[in-house]
Amino acid sequence: MSKFWSPFVKDLVPYVPGEQPKLTRLVKLNTNENPYGPSPKALAAMQAELNDNLRLYPDPNSDLLKNAVAKYYGVQNNQVFLGNGSDEVLAHIFHGLLQHDQPILFPDISYSFYPVYCGLYGITFDAVPLDAQFRINPADYAKPNGGIIFPNPNAPTGCLLALEAVEQILKGSPDSVVVVDEAYIDFGGETAISLVDRYPNLLVTQTLSKSRSLAGLRVGLAVGHPDLIEALERIKNSFNSYPIDRMANVGAAAAFEDREYFDKTCALVIESREWVVAQLQAKGFEVLPSAANFIFARHPQHDAAGLAAKLREQGVIVRHFKQERIAQFLRISIGTPEQNQALIDGLGEL
Protein backbone atom coordinates (compact mmCIF):
# COMPACT_ATOMS: atom_id res chain seq x y z
CA MET A 1 0.00 0.00 0.00
CA SER A 2 1.36 3.40 -0.97
CA LYS A 3 0.55 6.90 0.23
CA PHE A 4 0.17 7.83 -3.43
CA TRP A 5 -2.78 5.50 -4.02
CA SER A 6 -6.22 6.96 -4.55
CA PRO A 7 -8.53 5.99 -1.66
CA PHE A 8 -10.68 3.59 -3.69
CA VAL A 9 -7.64 1.55 -4.79
CA LYS A 10 -7.09 0.37 -1.21
CA ASP A 11 -10.42 -1.46 -1.23
CA LEU A 12 -10.15 -3.05 -4.68
CA VAL A 13 -10.07 -6.85 -4.85
CA PRO A 14 -8.51 -7.57 -8.27
CA TYR A 15 -9.30 -10.54 -10.48
CA VAL A 16 -6.82 -13.41 -10.18
CA PRO A 17 -6.10 -14.87 -13.65
CA GLY A 18 -5.38 -18.53 -14.20
CA GLU A 19 -1.78 -19.60 -13.88
CA GLN A 20 0.39 -19.22 -16.98
CA PRO A 21 3.33 -21.52 -16.20
CA LYS A 22 6.69 -20.86 -17.77
CA LEU A 23 7.53 -24.56 -18.05
CA THR A 24 6.46 -25.73 -21.50
CA ARG A 25 6.54 -29.43 -20.59
CA LEU A 26 3.45 -29.06 -18.39
CA VAL A 27 0.06 -30.14 -19.70
CA LYS A 28 -1.92 -26.93 -19.27
CA LEU A 29 -5.63 -27.61 -18.71
CA ASN A 30 -6.42 -24.69 -16.42
CA THR A 31 -7.36 -21.64 -18.51
CA ASN A 32 -9.72 -22.99 -21.19
CA GLU A 33 -7.51 -22.16 -24.15
CA ASN A 34 -8.21 -23.94 -27.41
CA PRO A 35 -5.82 -26.87 -27.92
CA TYR A 36 -5.83 -26.26 -31.66
CA GLY A 37 -4.10 -23.29 -33.27
CA PRO A 38 -5.74 -20.35 -35.02
CA SER A 39 -7.13 -20.59 -38.52
CA PRO A 40 -4.29 -20.76 -41.08
CA LYS A 41 -6.11 -17.99 -42.94
CA ALA A 42 -5.98 -15.81 -39.82
CA LEU A 43 -2.25 -16.45 -39.45
CA ALA A 44 -1.65 -15.64 -43.11
CA ALA A 45 -3.62 -12.40 -42.83
CA MET A 46 -1.57 -11.30 -39.82
CA GLN A 47 1.71 -12.20 -41.50
CA ALA A 48 0.71 -10.10 -44.51
CA GLU A 49 0.08 -7.18 -42.15
CA LEU A 50 3.69 -7.25 -40.93
CA ASN A 51 4.78 -4.32 -43.06
CA ASP A 52 5.62 -0.63 -42.93
CA ASN A 53 2.00 0.25 -42.14
CA LEU A 54 2.60 -0.71 -38.52
CA ARG A 55 3.97 2.81 -38.06
CA LEU A 56 0.41 4.07 -38.61
CA TYR A 57 -2.45 3.99 -36.14
CA PRO A 58 -5.07 1.31 -36.80
CA ASP A 59 -8.61 2.01 -37.97
CA PRO A 60 -10.40 3.32 -34.83
CA ASN A 61 -13.65 1.75 -36.04
CA SER A 62 -12.06 -1.58 -37.04
CA ASP A 63 -14.44 -1.67 -40.01
CA LEU A 64 -12.89 -4.77 -41.57
CA LEU A 65 -13.59 -6.83 -38.46
CA LYS A 66 -16.88 -5.14 -37.70
CA ASN A 67 -18.09 -5.97 -41.21
CA ALA A 68 -17.00 -9.58 -40.79
CA VAL A 69 -18.88 -9.93 -37.49
CA ALA A 70 -22.00 -8.25 -38.86
CA LYS A 71 -22.00 -10.49 -41.92
CA TYR A 72 -21.41 -13.64 -39.86
CA TYR A 73 -24.34 -12.97 -37.52
CA GLY A 74 -26.65 -11.23 -39.97
CA VAL A 75 -26.77 -7.91 -38.11
CA GLN A 76 -25.96 -4.29 -38.96
CA ASN A 77 -22.58 -2.68 -38.33
CA ASN A 78 -24.07 -0.30 -35.79
CA GLN A 79 -25.13 -3.32 -33.73
CA VAL A 80 -21.51 -4.46 -33.23
CA PHE A 81 -18.98 -3.25 -30.66
CA LEU A 82 -15.35 -4.38 -30.54
CA GLY A 83 -12.84 -4.32 -27.72
CA ASN A 84 -9.43 -5.51 -26.58
CA GLY A 85 -10.72 -8.86 -25.38
CA SER A 86 -14.19 -9.49 -24.01
CA ASP A 87 -12.94 -8.45 -20.56
CA GLU A 88 -12.53 -4.89 -21.84
CA VAL A 89 -15.95 -5.08 -23.50
CA LEU A 90 -17.46 -6.23 -20.20
CA ALA A 91 -15.66 -3.46 -18.30
CA HIS A 92 -17.22 -0.86 -20.60
CA ILE A 93 -20.64 -2.49 -20.17
CA PHE A 94 -20.41 -2.33 -16.38
CA HIS A 95 -19.17 1.26 -16.59
CA GLY A 96 -21.66 2.55 -19.14
CA LEU A 97 -24.80 0.46 -18.80
CA LEU A 98 -24.99 -1.12 -15.33
CA GLN A 99 -24.44 1.81 -12.96
CA HIS A 100 -27.94 2.41 -11.62
CA ASP A 101 -29.73 2.80 -8.29
CA GLN A 102 -30.78 -0.84 -8.07
CA PRO A 103 -28.28 -3.70 -7.59
CA ILE A 104 -27.39 -5.74 -10.64
CA LEU A 105 -28.00 -9.49 -10.64
CA PHE A 106 -25.68 -12.33 -11.58
CA PRO A 107 -25.27 -15.96 -10.45
CA ASP A 108 -23.44 -16.74 -7.24
CA ILE A 109 -21.27 -19.16 -9.20
CA SER A 110 -20.15 -17.34 -12.33
CA TYR A 111 -17.29 -15.42 -13.90
CA SER A 112 -15.27 -14.00 -11.01
CA PHE A 113 -14.56 -10.76 -12.88
CA TYR A 114 -18.17 -9.58 -12.36
CA PRO A 115 -17.77 -8.60 -8.67
CA VAL A 116 -14.39 -7.08 -9.53
CA TYR A 117 -16.05 -4.72 -12.02
CA CYS A 118 -18.68 -3.90 -9.42
CA GLY A 119 -15.96 -2.93 -6.96
CA LEU A 120 -14.13 -0.91 -9.59
CA TYR A 121 -17.18 1.11 -10.62
CA GLY A 122 -19.04 1.25 -7.31
CA ILE A 123 -21.93 -0.95 -8.46
CA THR A 124 -24.03 -2.83 -5.92
CA PHE A 125 -24.96 -6.39 -6.79
CA ASP A 126 -27.01 -9.35 -5.67
CA ALA A 127 -25.46 -12.77 -6.30
CA VAL A 128 -28.40 -15.04 -7.16
CA PRO A 129 -27.84 -18.67 -6.09
CA LEU A 130 -27.81 -21.32 -8.77
CA ASP A 131 -30.12 -24.24 -8.01
CA ALA A 132 -28.98 -27.59 -6.59
CA GLN A 133 -27.95 -28.73 -10.08
CA PHE A 134 -25.92 -25.50 -10.57
CA ARG A 135 -28.42 -24.12 -13.08
CA ILE A 136 -30.05 -20.71 -13.46
CA ASN A 137 -33.73 -20.45 -12.57
CA PRO A 138 -35.09 -17.57 -14.71
CA ALA A 139 -37.80 -16.83 -12.15
CA ASP A 140 -35.11 -15.83 -9.64
CA TYR A 141 -34.25 -12.84 -11.85
CA ALA A 142 -37.79 -11.48 -12.10
CA LYS A 143 -37.31 -8.85 -9.41
CA PRO A 144 -36.26 -5.18 -9.35
CA ASN A 145 -32.70 -4.77 -10.59
CA GLY A 146 -30.26 -2.39 -12.22
CA GLY A 147 -29.23 -4.93 -14.84
CA ILE A 148 -28.59 -8.63 -15.28
CA ILE A 149 -25.50 -10.45 -16.50
CA PHE A 150 -24.74 -14.15 -16.69
CA PRO A 151 -22.34 -16.39 -18.61
CA ASN A 152 -23.94 -18.89 -20.97
CA PRO A 153 -22.66 -21.56 -20.87
CA ASN A 154 -21.85 -20.82 -17.27
CA ALA A 155 -18.26 -20.40 -16.20
CA PRO A 156 -17.02 -22.30 -14.30
CA THR A 157 -19.77 -24.97 -14.33
CA GLY A 158 -20.23 -25.31 -18.11
CA CYS A 159 -24.01 -25.66 -17.74
CA LEU A 160 -26.09 -24.22 -20.59
CA LEU A 161 -29.25 -22.14 -20.28
CA ALA A 162 -31.64 -22.82 -23.16
CA LEU A 163 -32.53 -19.91 -25.43
CA GLU A 164 -36.15 -20.08 -24.27
CA ALA A 165 -35.00 -19.52 -20.68
CA VAL A 166 -32.81 -16.59 -21.76
CA GLU A 167 -35.88 -15.09 -23.38
CA GLN A 168 -37.83 -15.60 -20.16
CA ILE A 169 -35.26 -13.50 -18.29
CA LEU A 170 -35.48 -10.80 -20.97
CA LYS A 171 -39.25 -10.66 -20.71
CA GLY A 172 -39.06 -10.44 -16.92
CA SER A 173 -36.84 -7.32 -16.94
CA PRO A 174 -37.78 -5.23 -20.00
CA ASP A 175 -36.47 -2.02 -18.42
CA SER A 176 -33.03 -3.40 -17.54
CA VAL A 177 -30.04 -4.26 -19.69
CA VAL A 178 -29.58 -8.04 -19.84
CA VAL A 179 -26.06 -9.14 -20.79
CA VAL A 180 -25.46 -12.70 -21.98
CA ASP A 181 -21.75 -13.48 -21.76
CA GLU A 182 -21.19 -16.11 -24.46
CA ALA A 183 -17.47 -16.80 -24.17
CA TYR A 184 -18.08 -20.55 -24.63
CA ILE A 185 -21.27 -20.64 -26.71
CA ASP A 186 -19.68 -22.25 -29.77
CA PHE A 187 -19.00 -25.55 -28.00
CA GLY A 188 -22.60 -26.65 -27.68
CA GLY A 189 -25.04 -23.75 -27.31
CA GLU A 190 -27.22 -21.52 -29.44
CA THR A 191 -26.31 -17.84 -29.44
CA ALA A 192 -28.78 -15.26 -28.17
CA ILE A 193 -27.70 -12.89 -30.96
CA SER A 194 -30.77 -14.13 -32.83
CA LEU A 195 -32.86 -12.27 -30.23
CA VAL A 196 -31.23 -8.82 -30.37
CA ASP A 197 -33.66 -7.39 -32.92
CA ARG A 198 -36.62 -8.35 -30.71
CA TYR A 199 -35.23 -7.19 -27.35
CA PRO A 200 -33.66 -3.70 -27.25
CA ASN A 201 -32.38 -4.42 -23.73
CA LEU A 202 -30.30 -7.45 -24.80
CA LEU A 203 -26.53 -7.29 -25.19
CA VAL A 204 -24.55 -10.40 -26.15
CA THR A 205 -20.78 -10.58 -25.63
CA GLN A 206 -18.35 -13.02 -27.19
CA THR A 207 -14.61 -13.57 -27.44
CA LEU A 208 -12.21 -14.90 -30.04
CA SER A 209 -10.06 -16.43 -27.30
CA LYS A 210 -11.85 -19.76 -27.09
CA SER A 211 -13.51 -21.19 -30.20
CA ARG A 212 -11.29 -19.21 -32.58
CA SER A 213 -8.00 -19.88 -30.77
CA LEU A 214 -6.91 -16.23 -30.57
CA ALA A 215 -6.47 -15.76 -26.81
CA GLY A 216 -3.08 -14.17 -27.42
CA LEU A 217 -4.54 -11.56 -29.75
CA ARG A 218 -7.15 -10.07 -27.34
CA VAL A 219 -10.34 -9.50 -29.33
CA GLY A 220 -13.86 -9.37 -27.91
CA LEU A 221 -17.19 -8.13 -29.16
CA ALA A 222 -20.73 -7.24 -28.22
CA VAL A 223 -23.88 -7.34 -30.34
CA GLY A 224 -27.05 -5.49 -29.42
CA HIS A 225 -29.39 -2.59 -30.12
CA PRO A 226 -27.66 0.46 -31.67
CA ASP A 227 -28.51 2.55 -28.60
CA LEU A 228 -26.57 0.17 -26.36
CA ILE A 229 -23.68 0.03 -28.81
CA GLU A 230 -23.52 3.84 -28.96
CA ALA A 231 -23.12 3.96 -25.18
CA LEU A 232 -20.17 1.57 -25.40
CA GLU A 233 -18.60 3.58 -28.23
CA ARG A 234 -18.81 6.69 -26.06
CA ILE A 235 -17.03 4.89 -23.23
CA LYS A 236 -14.40 3.47 -25.61
CA ASN A 237 -13.63 6.85 -27.15
CA SER A 238 -13.24 8.35 -23.70
CA PHE A 239 -10.77 5.63 -22.76
CA ASN A 240 -8.91 4.19 -25.78
CA SER A 241 -9.96 4.95 -29.35
CA TYR A 242 -7.70 2.22 -30.79
CA PRO A 243 -8.43 -1.01 -28.87
CA ILE A 244 -8.10 -3.25 -31.96
CA ASP A 245 -4.61 -3.13 -33.47
CA ARG A 246 -3.81 -3.77 -37.12
CA MET A 247 -2.87 -7.40 -36.54
CA ALA A 248 -6.03 -8.12 -34.57
CA ASN A 249 -8.26 -6.40 -37.12
CA VAL A 250 -7.12 -8.53 -40.06
CA GLY A 251 -6.52 -11.75 -38.12
CA ALA A 252 -9.88 -11.78 -36.36
CA ALA A 253 -11.73 -10.89 -39.57
CA ALA A 254 -10.05 -13.80 -41.37
CA ALA A 255 -10.94 -16.13 -38.50
CA PHE A 256 -14.63 -15.27 -38.89
CA GLU A 257 -14.41 -15.92 -42.62
CA ASP A 258 -12.84 -19.37 -42.20
CA ARG A 259 -15.99 -21.25 -41.22
CA GLU A 260 -14.63 -24.64 -42.31
CA TYR A 261 -11.68 -24.52 -39.88
CA PHE A 262 -13.90 -23.18 -37.10
CA ASP A 263 -16.44 -25.99 -37.50
CA LYS A 264 -13.71 -28.64 -37.64
CA THR A 265 -11.87 -27.55 -34.50
CA CYS A 266 -15.04 -27.02 -32.47
CA ALA A 267 -16.17 -30.53 -33.41
CA LEU A 268 -12.81 -31.94 -32.29
CA VAL A 269 -13.11 -30.22 -28.90
CA ILE A 270 -16.68 -31.48 -28.43
CA GLU A 271 -15.66 -35.03 -29.34
CA SER A 272 -12.75 -34.90 -26.89
CA ARG A 273 -14.99 -33.46 -24.18
CA GLU A 274 -17.32 -36.45 -24.40
CA TRP A 275 -14.34 -38.81 -24.18
CA VAL A 276 -12.98 -37.06 -21.08
CA VAL A 277 -16.41 -37.11 -19.43
CA ALA A 278 -16.74 -40.86 -20.01
CA GLN A 279 -13.24 -41.53 -18.67
CA LEU A 280 -13.82 -39.46 -15.53
CA GLN A 281 -17.19 -41.04 -14.87
CA ALA A 282 -15.56 -44.45 -15.12
CA LYS A 283 -13.26 -43.34 -12.30
CA GLY A 284 -16.22 -42.35 -10.13
CA PHE A 285 -16.34 -38.61 -10.84
CA GLU A 286 -19.56 -36.66 -10.95
CA VAL A 287 -19.35 -34.44 -14.04
CA LEU A 288 -21.79 -31.59 -14.62
CA PRO A 289 -23.33 -31.39 -18.11
CA SER A 290 -21.06 -29.11 -20.14
CA ALA A 291 -21.59 -27.11 -23.32
CA ALA A 292 -18.15 -25.48 -23.01
CA ASN A 293 -14.55 -26.42 -23.79
CA PHE A 294 -14.08 -27.55 -20.20
CA ILE A 295 -15.79 -29.78 -17.67
CA PHE A 296 -16.58 -29.28 -13.98
CA ALA A 297 -16.14 -32.44 -11.92
CA ARG A 298 -15.85 -33.72 -8.37
CA HIS A 299 -15.08 -37.08 -6.82
CA PRO A 300 -17.17 -38.16 -3.81
CA GLN A 301 -14.20 -39.76 -2.06
CA HIS A 302 -11.31 -37.45 -2.90
CA ASP A 303 -10.59 -33.84 -1.97
CA ALA A 304 -10.43 -31.59 -5.03
CA ALA A 305 -7.40 -29.62 -3.85
CA GLY A 306 -5.58 -32.88 -3.23
CA LEU A 307 -6.44 -34.16 -6.69
CA ALA A 308 -5.21 -30.91 -8.25
CA ALA A 309 -1.93 -31.25 -6.34
CA LYS A 310 -1.61 -34.89 -7.42
CA LEU A 311 -2.13 -33.96 -11.06
CA ARG A 312 0.41 -31.17 -10.81
CA GLU A 313 2.98 -33.66 -9.56
CA GLN A 314 2.25 -35.58 -12.76
CA GLY A 315 2.76 -32.44 -14.86
CA VAL A 316 -0.92 -31.65 -15.44
CA ILE A 317 -2.42 -28.32 -14.31
CA VAL A 318 -6.16 -27.94 -13.72
CA ARG A 319 -8.14 -25.16 -12.00
CA HIS A 320 -9.34 -25.41 -8.41
CA PHE A 321 -11.54 -22.73 -6.84
CA LYS A 322 -11.66 -22.05 -3.11
CA GLN A 323 -15.21 -20.67 -3.14
CA GLU A 324 -17.06 -22.76 -0.55
CA ARG A 325 -19.89 -24.06 -2.70
CA ILE A 326 -17.56 -25.36 -5.43
CA ALA A 327 -14.45 -26.12 -3.38
CA GLN A 328 -14.73 -29.84 -4.15
CA PHE A 329 -14.87 -29.34 -7.91
CA LEU A 330 -12.11 -29.17 -10.50
CA ARG A 331 -12.47 -27.23 -13.72
CA ILE A 332 -10.63 -29.12 -16.43
CA SER A 333 -10.01 -27.67 -19.89
CA ILE A 334 -10.33 -29.97 -22.87
CA GLY A 335 -6.99 -30.50 -24.58
CA THR A 336 -5.66 -32.52 -27.46
CA PRO A 337 -6.21 -36.30 -27.28
CA GLU A 338 -2.65 -36.65 -25.97
CA GLN A 339 -3.20 -34.03 -23.26
CA ASN A 340 -6.51 -35.59 -22.28
CA GLN A 341 -4.84 -39.00 -21.97
CA ALA A 342 -2.16 -37.43 -19.76
CA LEU A 343 -4.94 -36.14 -17.50
CA ILE A 344 -6.51 -39.57 -17.14
CA ASP A 345 -3.14 -41.24 -16.64
CA GLY A 346 -2.19 -38.62 -14.06
CA LEU A 347 -5.23 -39.42 -11.96
CA GLY A 348 -4.22 -43.07 -11.84
CA GLU A 349 -6.30 -45.46 -9.76
CA LEU A 350 -8.78 -43.76 -7.43
UniProtKB/Swiss-Prot annotation:
The modification N6-(pyridoxal phosphate)lysine is found at K210. GO terms for molecular function: histidinol-phosphate transaminase activity; pyridoxal phosphate binding. Signal peptide: none annotated. It is an enzyme of class 2 (transferase). Keywords: Amino-acid biosynthesis, Aminotransferase, Histidine biosynthesis, Pyridoxal phosphate, Transferase. It comes from the Bacteria. Its cofactor is pyridoxal 5'-phosphate. Transmembrane segments: none annotated. Its EC number is 2.6.1.9. The keyword Transferase applies. Pathway: Amino-acid biosynthesis; L-histidine biosynthesis; L-histidine from 5-phospho-alpha-D-ribose 1-diphosphate: step 7/9. Coiled coil: none annotated. Pfam families: Aminotran_1_2 (PF00155). GO terms for biological process: L-histidine biosynthetic process. It catalyses: L-histidinol phosphate + 2-oxoglutarate = 3-(imidazol-4-yl)-2-oxopropyl phosphate + L-glutamate. HAMAP family: HisC_aminotrans_2. Belongs to the class-II pyridoxal-phosphate-dependent aminotransferase family. Histidinol-phosphate aminotransferase subfamily. Homodimer. This is Histidinol-phosphate aminotransferase 1. It comes from Pseudomonas fluorescens (strain Pf0-1).
